């Protein structure tokens, strides 16, 4: 009985979840790649991308499905099935994965490098993000599922003005006991932006072999530590974080993401044998955003995921400036040689592996900064 009792420890189950996902990915990887190759599910490279990427044409894509399968099996094996946060993260992950799958399918079957129309993709992302945001506004605030509906009714009965408990406040890192109450509408708006924004940010970063998956593993692992802290009464009290009942179980899911991500990196490292595609990138980004919201570390996610943030900003700045100058001068001008930012460095002479490893190093440093907020407050 004592041997069985050790499985009550979240830390042990997290280690086992990581190992299980890693093993599933390593064992199933070659078969999945072989099957994708047989089905001719190859990457269609954009004509306006770097010329060096033309050799990647035909490389199997949609390998993110392998990541999602490994995460799901490992999580269901080792996580608590009645934990609401585990389920909401899984649902968001697979919801965004479905969007990515449809996008990849269009690219592969119709040989359309652009994939699903941007407006259609954004509509589904916005819908899933909004549903998750509304649920989390009350799930994070209520200690148990039985209190969700009463809390919602109380908010409606107050004329939509009732504030949320302090555990739902926006936490400002590096400052002791500094947080800002968001209210239901503010919480929903911020959560929606974090989930949808992170999903797209990871997707934009996924442009070089191994570039997106390793930062995802590092950021996801760090969020697992935050989940463990805020999910325990003793640690959260000692470190001055809000106590979120049930959040500690997300450490198991984060560990599964880490294991599955490392397994995928085995095959995605340069020269990549398979790409994750939108099915993987959108899903993993959605997962990171959702977990960060639950553990109340939206700003820390912004810090640790700095590579994702800068990649996204580079695209936004490039597009905005190009449209503005085209309208004003009749010819569009660019700030970067090419966007996202990793292509800017490629065109500037950096080797693909140099860009990837340097972005990994930057992410590792940013993650350490994020983890330092556990104590430096």
From Swiss-Prot:
Source superkingdom: Bacteria
Q: Name one GO biological process term.
A: cell wall organization
- EC number(s): the record gives 2.7.8.13
GO CC terms? plasma membrane
Specify the pathway.
Answer: Cell wall biogenesis; peptidoglycan biosynthesis
Family statement: Belongs to the glycosyltransferase 4 family. MraY subfamily.
PANTHER family per record: PHOSPHO-N-ACETYLMURAMOYL-PENTAPEPTIDE-TRANSFERASE, PHOSPHO-N-ACETYLMURAMOYL-PENTAPEPTIDE-TRANSFERASE HOMOLOG
Question: What is the name listed in the Swiss-Prot or TrEMBL entry for this protein?
Answer: Phospho-N-acetylmuramoyl-pentapeptide-transferase
| Organism name | Bordetella parapertussis (strain 12822 / ATCC BAA-587 / NCTC 13253)
């Amino acid at each position: 009985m004592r041997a069985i009792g050790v499985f009550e420890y979240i830390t042990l189950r997290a280690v086992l979840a990581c190992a299980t996902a890693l093993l599933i990915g390593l064992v199933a990887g070659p078969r999945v790649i072989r099957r994708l190759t047989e089905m001719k599910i190859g990457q269609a490279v954009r004509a306006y991308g770097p010329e060096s990427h033309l050799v990647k044409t035909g490389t199997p894509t949609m390998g993110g499905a392998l990541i999602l399968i490994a995460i799901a099996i490992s999580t269901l094996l080792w996580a608590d099935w009645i934990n609401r946060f585990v389920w909401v993260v899984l649902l968001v992950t697979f919801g965004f994965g479905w969007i990515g799958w449809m996008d990849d399918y269009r690219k592969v079957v119709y040989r359309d490098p652009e994939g699903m129309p941007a407006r259609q993709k954004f509509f589904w992302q916005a819908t899933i993000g909004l549903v998750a945001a509304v649920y989390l506004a009350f799930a994070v605030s209520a200690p148990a599922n039985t209190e969700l509906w009463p809390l919602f009714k109380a908010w409606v009965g107050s004329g939509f003005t009732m504030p949320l408990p302090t555990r739902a406040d926006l936490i400002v890192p590096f400052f002791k006991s500094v947080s800002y109450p968001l209210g239901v509408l503010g919480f929903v708006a911020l959560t929606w932006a974090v989930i949808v924004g992170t999903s797209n940010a990871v997707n934009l970063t996924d442009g070089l072999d191994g570039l997106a998956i390793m930062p995802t593993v590092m950021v996801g692992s760090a969020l697992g530590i935050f989940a463990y802290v805020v999910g325990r009464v003793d640690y959260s009290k000692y470190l001055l974080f809000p106590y979120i009942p049930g959040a500690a179980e997300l450490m198991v899911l984060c560990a599964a993401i880490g294991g599955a991500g490392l397994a995928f990196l085995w095959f995605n490292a340069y020269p990549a044998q398979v790409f994750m595609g939108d099915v993987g990138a959108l899903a993993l980004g959605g997962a990171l955003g959702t977990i960060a919201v639950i553990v109340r570390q939206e700003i820390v996610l912004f810090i640790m995921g700095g590579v994702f943030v800068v990649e996204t900003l580079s695209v936004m700045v490039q597009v905005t400036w190009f449209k503005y100058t085209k309208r004003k001068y009749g010819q569009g001008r660019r700030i970067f040689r090419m966007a996202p930012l990793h292509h800017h460095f490629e065109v500037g002479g950096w080797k693909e592996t140099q860009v990837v490893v340097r972005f990994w190093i930057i992410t590792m440093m940013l993650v350490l900064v994020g983890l330092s907020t556990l104590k430096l407050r």
